Amino acid sequence: HNPRQCHTTKNWSRYLSLYQLGYGTSRGIGYRDSSQDLMGVMSHMPEEALELAKNLLSVQRPEGNAMHQYAPLALAEDNGNEANAGDSREKKGVLDEKGQPAYADWYGDDHLWIVLTVANYLKETGKLELLKEEIPFYEAGKKRAQREKGSVLEHLKRSLAFTHSHMGKHGLPLLGFADWNDCMHLPLGAESN
C-alpha cells in the first residue's frame, strides 16, 4: 500500500462535506469504510487511527452489531442521534408473501471490520491495555453517560457473538443488509458463502 494515499483516504474521503459530517443527516461516515481506511494507516499513524476506531466502537450497539453510518459532528455534540442504520431503512417494512420482513434491518459485516482494525492496532503497538478501556455502546436517544459501557475486549466479543448468533442452517453467517457489498440486498435468511 502507498502510505500517502492511505493517509489521504483516511483524512479526506469521508470528510469532504457537511453532508457526511453533519448533525443527524441522512448520511454520515460509513462504519465499514472507515474501519478499512484505518487498517491502511495503522502502521504509520496508529494513535490517530485509534481515535477514529474508538468513535466507531462507540456506535456499536449492545447486541454487537454496529450502526452503518455516523455523523462526527453529532458525535462530538453527544446529542443521542449521531448514528443511523444506513440504507437498510429503505427496506424497513417490506414484507414477503407470508407477511414476514423480507429484508434484514441490520448489517452483518460492519461490526466485524472493527475486530480486524483493533487487531491491527494491537499488532502495531503492542498496547494491550487498550482492551481494558471502557467505551459506551450506542443506544439511540441516550447521551453517552447514560449508555451501557463495555471494555474494548467486550465490544470485540459482542461483535463475534452477534455473527455467531446469526448463522444459517448450513453454519454460514446470515447476510444482513448490503453485507460485504453495498449493492447486495438479498432476502432475509440468505447465507454468506
Where are these regions (language model features)?
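Low-complexity, Ser/Thr/Pro/Gly-enriched N-terminal "stalk/linker" regions
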Residues: 1-25, 51, 55, 162, ...
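N-terminal, helix-rich and Lys/Arg-enriched segments in bacterial and organellar proteins
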Residues: 3, 12-14, 40, 68-73, ...
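Active-site-adjacent structural elements in folded domains
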Residues: 16-26, 98-101, 178-193
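Aromatic-rich carbohydrate-recognition surfaces in CAZymes
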Residues: 29-34, 38-173
